[in-house]
């Protein structure tokens, strides 16, 4: 029973201390992840365009 009280108390202190700190490092991490997602999206759009052109060339070559 005492362990549960200690655990809840420590979790509360941790939540308060993390809530008061500035989220600068978390924001930077989020921006990096967002940028990776944007690059992945852009690359997949380019690949789909190239694949469509290749399919058109193959269909034209077959007649």
From Swiss-Prot:
Transmembrane segments: none annotated. InterPro entries: Cecropin (IPR000875), Cecropin_insect (IPR020400). It is found in: Secreted. One of its GO terms (biological process) is defense response to Gram-positive bacterium. The keyword Signal applies. PROSITE patterns: CECROPIN. Its main location: secreted. Residues 1-22 form the signal peptide. The modification Arginine amide is found at residue 62. Keywords: Amidation, Antibiotic, Antimicrobial, Immunity, Innate immunity, Secreted, Signal. It comes from the Eukaryota. GO terms for cellular component: extracellular region; extracellular space. Belongs to the cecropin family. PANTHER family: CECROPIN-A1-RELATED. Cecropins have lytic and antibacterial activity against several Gram-positive and Gram-negative bacteria. This is Cecropin-B. The lineage of its organism: Eukaryota, Metazoa, Ecdysozoa, Arthropoda, Hexapoda.
């Amino acid at each position: 029973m005492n362990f549960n009280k200690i655990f809840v108390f420590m979790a509360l202190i941790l939540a308060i201390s993390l809530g008061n700190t500035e989220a600068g490092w978390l924001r930077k991490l989020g921006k990096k992840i967002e940028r990776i997602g944007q690059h992945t999206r852009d690359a997949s759009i380019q690949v789909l365009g190239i694949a469509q052109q290749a399919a058109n060339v193959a269909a034209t070559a077959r007649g």
